[in-house]
Amino acid sequence: MRNAVGLDISKLTFDASAMVGNAEYSAKFDNDSKGLNQFSDRLKSLGCQNLHICMEATGNYYEEVADYFAQYYSVYVVNPLKISKYAESRFKRTKTDKQDAKLIAQYCRSAKESELVKRQKPTDEQYRLLRMTAAYAQIKSECAAMKNRHHAAKDEEAAKAY
């Protein structure tokens, strides 16, 4: 069984749950350079050579954390739907960030090697393309919503507003 760390990352903080051997650890860190350094020190204190860090691809808050630790460890960024399906299969409904981090660590620990794809830090050009693609998707979604509101408008004055 692999040694795993699950991270639940938000804008300001991230929760970490580590499963090393038979021991479990959990902690919360600020999502900034100081927090990354504190978390890095905590990982080093575990004395584990072969550590796998897993997190969900939610928003863009995970990117800096993933890229930083991919330099030193095996880092996996997982589709949130996979974690959700994993939770359903284990009849778990998490309510807190700490529980989410533990669930992600459990997934990382039990997933088949073929289900985990190592994080490779994107180039600046790839980041730019990702941002443009996300912006395009957002604009497309907003246009569709605007068309739906216009179509649903009951009177002529309301239709003019859209």
Report the location of each language-model feature.
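Phosphate- and other anionic-substrate recognition elements at nucleic-acid/protein interfaces
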Residues: M1-Y162
